[in-house]
Amino acid sequence: PAEYEIPARHSLPIPFKRIPRYVETFTADFVLEPRKESSDHHTLIVQGDPQIKDFFWDNSAEAYRDVVIPDIIKTRKSIATPCYGIELGDVIYNELTVYPVYLHNTDRVNMVTFNVIGNHDHDQTTLLKDSLGTMHYEMHLGPTCYSANIGRVHYIFIDDILYDRKDAKESYRHG
């Protein structure tokens, strides 16, 4: 609900509870903290396609750490309203081991950041079945489809990449 803080661990919103497989019943309790200030007027800092590769590969991780993140921090400090981030996908560039690099640097901003999955965030080795390609993303960043209320706005974050295909030579169909 909009009048409560968005539960987060560092920069990562945690608006969900994982449901264990093979259980007949499951209870998820959420602790809601009232907001200290209204979020009716808020600011979104939006970025897309950082496509981070591992350090020393193409300098994308270094550029994200040394240029992009300091710029976001500077921008964030100059804004008086509550700030939230939205990452529009392709957080990494096909390297599943780089999610911790992204998270470590995003945590430095001190701002809840909502993530949307991109085609390069999918596990490229499992692309014949779309549902298999999101496992690593979900382990690090959470669900691929979710929503959040900030102020009077309801934000919806949707995985619009459909990777089911007949063979590995085909590209993804939508997104």
Show which residues each predicted segment covers.
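N-terminal active-site segment of His-dependent metallophosphoesterases
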Residues: 5-99
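Extended active-site neighborhood of metal-dependent phosphoesterases/phosphodiesterases
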Residues: 8, 96-175
